[in-house]
């Protein structure tokens, strides 16, 4: 399934590919690997949807292409960013998959939305704060109870594919922006500390 021009914030659009073909999934993973093996830190958004809770054993509703296991365990070129991902990690583990424990970031633990005093900020809160207000309503596009029963079926309805794509993009883009701001602040602090050093930077 190829969904072109899925609307996100402003005039931005996503080009989304959803497949149940293992060979196509492996090609996509290979393409990602080629793109991320560069000089700069690379982040990959991760989110896991589950099969129906009322039809045990519940497991990750994911395909297991041959490249997925080493992709999740890779430790040099990229870091996975997710949101409240302890449940996702456990569900992946029960399906025989595991993310490298040294290469993932739980955004919910690393970032707080300023001036919003609640215990746990949602992805919608964070993405709405750092990307665009559009994302504040992203979770309202599906029925959190009934639609979550559909993740284990094939083919998935288009609106759930769109939802999953927006969710993954919001996770990735949120952390990329947060990390970019953090790096900029650290660089500015370092320059300020060495402002009077004529040899700094050489």
Positions of predicted regions on the chain:
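Short acidic, Gly/Ser-rich segments with clustered Asp/Glu that frequently serve as metal-coordination loops
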Residues: 43-44, 48-57
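Acidic, Mg2+-coordinating catalytic module of metal-dependent nucleases/exonucleases
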Residues: 128-201
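Short alpha-helix plus adjacent loop in nuclease-associated cores
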Residues: 107-128
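Short His-Asn-centered micro-motif
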Residues: 46-48, 66, 81-85
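Short active-site oxyanion
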Residues: 75-80
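Short active-site loop/helix that positions an aromatic residue
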Residues: 54, 88-96
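N-terminal accessory regions of nucleic-acid-interacting proteins
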Residues: 1-44, 107, 173-176, 183-202
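A short alpha->loop->secondary-structure connector
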Residues: 95-104
């Amino acid at each position: 399934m190829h969904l072109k021009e899925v609307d996100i914030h402003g005039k931005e659009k996503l080009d989304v590919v959803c497949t149940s073909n293992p060979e196509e999934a492996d090609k996509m993973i290979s393409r990602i690997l080629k793109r991320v093996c560069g000089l700069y830190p690379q982040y990959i958004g991760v989110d896991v949807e589950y099969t129906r809770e009322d039809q045990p054993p519940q497991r990750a509703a994911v395909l297991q292409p041959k490249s997925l296991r080493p992709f999740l365990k890779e430790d040099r070129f990229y870091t996975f960013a997710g949101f409240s991902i302890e449940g996702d990690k456990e569900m992946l583990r029960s399906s025989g998959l595991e993310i490298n424990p040294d290469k993932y970031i739980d955004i919910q633990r690393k970032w707080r939305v300023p001036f919003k005093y609640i215990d746990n900020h949602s992805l919608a809160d964070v993405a709405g704060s750092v990307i665009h207000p559009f994302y504040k309503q992203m979770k309202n596009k599906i029925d959190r109870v009934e639609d979550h029963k559909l993740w284990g079926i094939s083919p998935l309805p288009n609106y759930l594919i769109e939802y999953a794509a927006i969710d993954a993009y919001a996770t990735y883009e949120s952390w990329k922006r947060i990390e970019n701001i953090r790096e900029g602040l650290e660089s500015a602090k370092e320059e300020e500390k060495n402002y009077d050093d004529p040899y700094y930077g050489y």
